[in-house]
Amino acid sequence: MPKVEIYSKMFCPYCVRAKRLLTEKGVSFQEYDITLGGPQRAEMIQRAHGSTTVPQIFIDDAHIGGSDDLAALERAGKLDPLLAG
């Protein structure tokens, strides 16, 4: 299974939605809580090509985008192949 990473903040409904979808699919993921900012927030912005919103999701270092992007991949039937590696 590929490496899945998600940058999130506390009390973020979009973050909850994205994590719920991944959890329902049985996907383990590394979560980085950037609620307080810090170096991980700067890292996220760099990796996400300037995006500052959360969540920001990466699958095997490929930038997927946010919760809506993840949901769109799921609706299009493209998420499972990405998660299969």
PLM region spans:
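Chalcogenol-based redox active-site neighborhoods
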Residues: 25, 52, 80
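Non-catalytic, surface beta->alpha helical segment in thiol-disulfide oxidoreductase systems
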Residues: 59-85
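Thioredoxin-like thiol-disulfide oxidoreductase module
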Residues: 34-52, 83-85
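Residues that form or flank phosphate/diphosphate-binding pockets in enzymes
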Residues: 16, 39, 65
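Anionic group-transfer/hydrolysis microenvironments
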Residues: 7, 35, 62
